[in-house]
Amino acid sequence: EIRPLPDRAGTGAPFSLRIQELEHLSDLTWPADEIEEIGKWRLRISDGFTMRANSVLPTGAAPFGEPNLDIEKAVDEVVKIYQEKGLTPTFTLPLPLYEELDNYLGDIGWGVKVGAEYLVNDITDNLDLESADFQIVISTEPTLEWLEVQSDHQLERIMRNYPARYGQIKFENKTIAIGRIATFGKRSLATRVFVNPEFRGKGIGALLMRALMAAAKGDGATKVGLQVDSENGAGLALYKSMGFRFHHFYNYRVLSDVSK
């Protein structure tokens, strides 16, 4: 069970518990089609389109997350299960909590597919949503127009498996930015945030995030998190300019030799 933490995002409880709570939020609001378990390892299995819903999330104590098998046997079982499903064996590894597991997998040939930062922020009362040029639309489901922006049709089933708000920014009746935000208790998580490259640098990303945070606030959230590829310098700069703070890093590690 994940214990509730203090109100200010990213502070208060022991760091390991804060990491676990945020990763639980990510897991809960982006639910996989199927879950198998090896002790306290959650094997998330879907259609392969998104790494989060198709990867192992350790949830137990460090250093390895408490699989109920010897670490070598547990990893072999992960490989077997994912390959039987036609999926690439993948781990989501929050750091530094599971740094030893991350290093172990690296030593036996698992490569880093993506490294990302988990950012957090508090949702304030004064969210400026005024715009003379752009229209904000918030809905409770992903419309066809929303899905078409990033060709997210394959994600629709996963997204509909948890209640969320879907934001759009429109210019001259054309959708130029989208995002999703889902709330659990006082915490919310923003995902699938995207701005049409032709409209970047105009404050649209910040406007979209404020609109999403306002929607989450209406659902009871006081805090927001999001995950950003560590190589997305522009995105990291935008969010940090809005007051988002770095909380922790995580790697997606994949089995390099999938014929193993």
Where are these regions (language model features)?
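Conserved GNAT acetyl-CoA-binding A-motif
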Residues: Q83-P94, A216-Q227
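N-terminal charged segments
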Residues: E1-E84, L97-Y98, D102, I158-R160
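A short, internal acetyl-CoA/4′-phosphopantetheine-binding micro-motif in the GNAT/acyltransferase core
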Residues: L57-P67, V193-R200, D229
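A conserved beta-strand-loop-helix scaffold within acyl/acetyltransferase catalytic domains
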Residues: E156-P197
